[in-house]
Amino acid sequence: MTKKLTIKRKVKEPEPQNEAPDSHESSDNEEEEEEDLLQAVKDPGEDSTDDEGIDQEYQTDSSEDLEFESDEEGNYLGRKGAEGSSGDDDEESAEDEEEEDDADAKKSSKNNDEEAATTSKSIKKSQEKPTSSNKVVPVVPARDPSKVEYADSDTSDEEDIRNTVGNIPMHWYDEYKHIGYDWDAKKIVKPPKGDQIDDFLRKIEDPNFWRTVKDPLTGQEVLLTDADIALIKRINSGRIPNEEHDEYAPWIEWFTSEVEKMPIKNVPDHKRSFLPSGSEKKTVSRMVHALKMGWMKTTEEVQREKQEKRGPKFYMLWETDTSREQMRRIHDPVSAPKRDLPGHAESYNPPPEYLFDEKEAKEWHKLKDEPHRRKLHFMPQKFKSLREVPAYSRYLRERFLRCLDLYLCPRAKRVKLNIDAEYLIPKLPSPRDLQPFPTVESLVYRGHTDLVRSVSVEPKGEYLVSGSDDKTVKIWEIATGRCIRTIETEDVVRCVAWCPNAKLSIIAVATGSRLLLVNPKVGDKLLVKKTDDLLAEAPVLDVIENERIKTAVQWANAEPADQEKGVRVIITHFKPIRQVTWHGRGDYLATVMPEGANRSALIHQLSKRRSQIPFSKSKGLIQCVLFHPVKPCFFVATQHNIRIYDLVKQELIKKLLTNSKWISGMSIHPKGDNLLVSTYDKKMLWFDLDLSTKPYQTMRLHRNAVRSVAFHLRYPLFASGSDDQAVIVSHGMVYNDLLQNPLIVPLKKLQTHEKREEFGVLDVNWHPVQPWVFSTGADCTIRLFT
């Protein structure tokens, strides 16, 4: 059964303002579109987008009616106007009209060229103008429907992807005007969306509406081909999508299904497999002998002995005997509070200080109306002997009030708070959340023959210098562990320090009473040459040095023999040097001589080659000194206390109380607000310089004396080395908010050093860039933990 709908197409005369000469305004593209449209009108049967079983024909009569035939499913174009009401007559003459329409279409195709041209122009104008509910807009497919999308290959991996956003939810672009980006990084604008009326008209008028889908990547409408529709139908019906696939192909038996009965080995059973086991026979005979001798007991005997040990079992016949007594009594009775015991004031002969004077007696009588405000509910009296004590006049009243309290006052139990000890411990973050920090031993630098006392790292983090009791200074390459240079000295090397200024290559070596300024000759050659030029000539001093300074320290250039080793300047002190430290800029350095009394600490200026003694009096045995990283402050640590001096004003700023027996070392935070102190009495002290002069936190993490502590320059980490051969790495976060306390969390205990003569780890130092820590020990090694 077919239906025929007629659409009247009225060709309007073009308006005069839109007319233009054909020879000037028509372009090549317009001519091509007109030819395509004429070809589509002449050969409607060649359209590959029509579904099977749907015949569509064009009829061009003198009345300019356009007719379509459709099946019962309703796939036909809508109609404009009120014509086409004769549906039953068309059904009866459907076959005759089809033949007439074919003939009329061929004859009238030539006569309707002008009408087709006019129609193509109207279609172009309708595409350029926005659609309305009264006009039908032709749907232009996004691709050629006659061309199979994956005709050249069997996969969709090589399809033409115009939107490069990838496999993401496309609803992310709902709020934007574009839907993605093309290969030229230009926005793909969303096509205009019609309203419900436009969708309804398209559904009525477009015969391909049912096979049109929307591409979510580009927003364009794609017309499904016959092959796509056939594939969808096969999938919906539960069949295999590929039509060429044979589901019932003959089975090819690649491997045999018959069970092979031949054994892998056909060795006859041994004779001993048919005979009883000799070892089991011996075991059974031993058990029988043990049972006869009474050494071994049967299961029944063991159970009988257990029952005898338990004894008879008694139980209550009536369980209510005890519960009845409990029900008769008051549940959970609260005992009466006891009266306070008498004190010295209630004695018949109290001490004089408990007696009231005139003023106290007057105040006691004044509070007669408010007895609860009195200090005592009675007035103390003094008698010479117990015989003179009269009867207590308030005895009956107090007994009566006591009975009232017991009878009328409610009693309640005070619940004691059972606080778990773990609840009071502050909750610390997990060490996994505080990474990175060193966890394993990566390298061991071997080469020294005696204990290594000090270690220092180059500012760039490529080289390492170490000083040992074997009177040598070794320069190592950190990455490979190779010893690049060894410098021999005349005495034990107590301390080494690399200049923190990256523009200079200088190592300060404290050996005996001499301070050596060494050029290691590693790294950039221009930097090495610049350092030699700086230390080559001594500047002229305008200020005459004091005799007190001349007797304490002397500057001199190194001898030619020492020059070959790399030593450039030698600063000779009058006492053995224990520690040397640099200022952050690399021009000043300080030395400590514990035996120097009031000249124990000296400050040297490298550029002017002069020294100065900052203190005129000795306020204790100086152990170590330190420069502030930002401010012109100088930290001096004695055995028990730490003093902070202002170098500009030359005055004492603060004195830190450590409450320790002996200070071994200290390190300051890069921001300069927190100080870490190590002591020989197994403690580490954290000082908040803005908070108090007493330790903010005392950490007892080691079992022996703590020799050294060090802060990292970049990461919130600090490390400590002790004589228990352990290096403990901790997290120390200092916040910019002054109201928030520092966060201190112990992270890792690294214990790989060996103990030699009660000594363990002697010094620790951090890598300037990486979260790596170096440690020196009495086992003549330097160890790197990463």
Swiss-Prot record:
Residues 1-161 are annotated as: Disordered. Residues 28-37, 46-55, 62-74, 86-103, 151-160 have a biased composition (Acidic residues). It is found in: Nucleus, Nucleolus; Nucleus, Nucleoplasm. Gene3D superfamilies: YVTN repeat-like/Quinoprotein amine dehydrogenase. The keyword rRNA processing applies. PROSITE patterns: WD_REPEATS_1, WD_REPEATS_2, WD_REPEATS_REGION. One of its GO terms (cellular component) is preribosome, large subunit precursor. The keyword Zinc-finger does not apply. Required for maturation of ribosomal RNAs and formation of the large ribosomal subunit. This is Ribosome biogenesis protein BOP1 homolog.
